């Protein structure tokens, strides 16, 4: 079945995302970490490309997102920005780059923006980081919030289970979402929370709510690209829809290349100078 390709070549901005919510148009968002993949994702009509700290997992093989550094995030962000013409590029601020105090967070934010030429940043947390969020936004840097399951806090929670299932945590999430909007965030990611709660947040806020494992009654969806392309063979969470099985496709292609080299079938006469 043919996919969706936008004929609108205008650069996606924070204002356009808000307009999309207002007219009921869903926002598409995927991760990318390198130039080649970013070109493909942008060319396919993606609205937002997230240079996620999930690069720590899918690119570097770490168990959590915690080890990735500011320098490494800037490297990935630079590579992605070079490959993008239309999509908005949002960069995750890595663990340790903004949790200390607001001035350290601002310095990290300015460095990412100056060196990568990205369009916006994403931070995990609510009330506990609100002063940092305000400081970054006051410097003219657009900020996307992130609530619910927050992978940078995995050592606090101990598990990647669904968050905000009890009333107290759900009410805190709602309060935090309003605080982030009031602080000036242009959008919020809600990760792995009950669909009814995500729907409530999306209905109460005027800014876009992007879900990952947060149901279908939000303003957009985000996934890790390796997951939706089926490159991580053993990763099959309930919220994931796999649009390809690239693990099998790539393994087959590589094994055929190995076979051709071993059997002296590659290169042939037409593939030589």
Swiss-Prot record:
Q: Which reaction(s) does the protein catalyse, per the Swiss-Prot or TrEMBL entry?
A: 3-methyl-2-oxobutanoate + (6R)-5,10-methylene-5,6,7,8-tetrahydrofolate + H2O = 2-dehydropantoate + (6S)-5,6,7,8-tetrahydrofolate
Which amino acids does the record list as binding 3-methyl-2-oxobutanoate? Answer: 53-54, 92, 122
Its annotated compartments are: Cytoplasm
Origin: domain of life:
Bacteria
One GO term (biological process): pantothenate biosynthetic process
Q: In which pathway does it act?
A: Cofactor biosynthesis; (R)-pantothenate biosynthesis; (R)-pantoate from 3-methyl-2-oxobutanoate: step 1/2
One Pfam family, short name: Pantoate_transf
Q: Which UniProt keywords apply?
A: Cytoplasm, Magnesium, Metal-binding, Pantothenate biosynthesis, Transferase
Role: Catalyzes the reversible reaction in which hydroxymethyl group from 5,10-methylenetetrahydrofolate is transferred onto alpha-ketoisovalerate to form ketopantoate.
Q: How does it assemble?
A: Homodecamer; pentamer of dimers.
Q: Which protein family is it in?
A: Belongs to the PanB family.
Protein name from the UniProt record: 3-methyl-2-oxobutanoate hydroxymethyltransferase
